[in-house]
Amino acid sequence: MINGYLNARYVDGGRGEVVSGVRQFDCWGLAEAVRQELLGLPRLPEFGVISRHDLKGSAASYRCYAGYLDEGPPRPGAIAAVIRGRLCTHVGVVLEIEGRLAVLETNEATGVRWMRIPDFERTYLRVRYHLDRDL
């Protein structure tokens, strides 16, 4: 199920482009691709820049997404948003892996990986989960 994503490469702004046979994602691109491709969820509307190099722009986009999605408990397909201060600095997507909830994420330091919810919440101390209204 997720094996095709585990070999992807982290690239800021990556939305799943294939370069030399390897898909490239940043954290938002990976979350969107997994939601659409694995879970069949509709693409979320574009609200602007999402880049680790533009945290203010990303924060503005996050506020739009947070208003569009409901906050709630982790469920498959939910966006796991990492919050620092008033900024969303990172996202992952919740999946059921080996019968338990986990977050699939990517970042420059680790590449694509998955972590059980308790491990994700220990790594990132403030996490909010955002769900499609019909999940």
What are these regions (language model features)?
Residues 91-113:
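Catalytic Cys-His active-site segments of thiol-dependent hydrolases/isopeptidases
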Residues 17-20, 96, 115:
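Intrinsically disordered, low-complexity, compositionally biased regions/tails
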